[in-house]
Regions:
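Alpha4 helix (beta4-alpha4-beta5 surface) of REC/receiver domains from two-component response regulators
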Residues: 66-70, 90-112, 118, 122
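Conserved sequence signature across two-component system core domains
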Residues: 11-12, 35, 56
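Conserved phosphotransfer microenvironments
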Residues: 41, 59-74
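Short acidic/polar segment at the start of the alpha1 helix of CheY-like receiver
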Residues: 14-21, 63-64, 95
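Two-component/phosphorelay signaling modules centered on CheY-like receiver
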Residues: 15-35
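Non-catalytic signal-transmission and effector/linker regions of two-component phosphorelay proteins
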Residues: 1-9, 13-16, 42, 116-138
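Active-site beta3 strand of CheY-like receiver
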Residues: 50-62
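His-Asp phosphorelay/catalytic-motif detector in bacterial-type signaling
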Residues: 52-54, 80-85
Length: 138
């Protein structure tokens, strides 16, 4: 169950995936901001700083390179964005497995492509539930 007013920033190099995220998440009541991975990591990080989304959903491997991993590291190292929950939505199962300990430490959820839409929405809801628990413990 979504809450109106929450903003999700989706980052991907595939316009069809961005369109899917826009349609799916908007229908659930979220404000959706789309960011194409054709830009630099710095540009996308600046967008995340500017938008201050409640959640980032991003790809991991772009054009065979680990650009998503670089962006994730930048998000986690930046004091203005490190608090933003991240879901990595990727088809790069091998890379996810290799970096699973790092992803766990960074508190990053992973959804492997191809994904079931209901599963993605369950993970989004889980992120909101965990964010609520974290704010109650602060």
């Amino acid at each position: 169950m979504s809450e109106s007013g929450r903003t999700i920033l989706a980052v991907n190099d595939d316009p069809a995936i961005l369109s899917l995220f826009d349609d799916l998440l908007s229908e659930e009541g979220y404000q959706v901001v789309l960011d194409q991975f054709s830009r630099t990591t710095t540009d996308i990080l600046n967008d995340i700083r500017r938008v201050q989304p409640d959640l980032v959903i991003m790809d991991f491997i772009i054009g065979g390179e680990g650009t998503g991993w670089q962006l994730l590291q930048a998000v986690r190292m930046d004091r203005t964005t490190r608090h933003v929950p991240v879901i990595v939505c990727t088809g790069a199962a091998r890379q996810v497995e290799e970096l699973s300990a790092h992803l766990d430490t960074m508190n990053v959820r992973v959804v492997l492509k191809p994904f079931d839409i209901d599963h993605l929405l369950e993970i989004v809801d889980l992120v909101w539930a965990n964010a609520g628990e974290a704010s109650r413990s602060e």
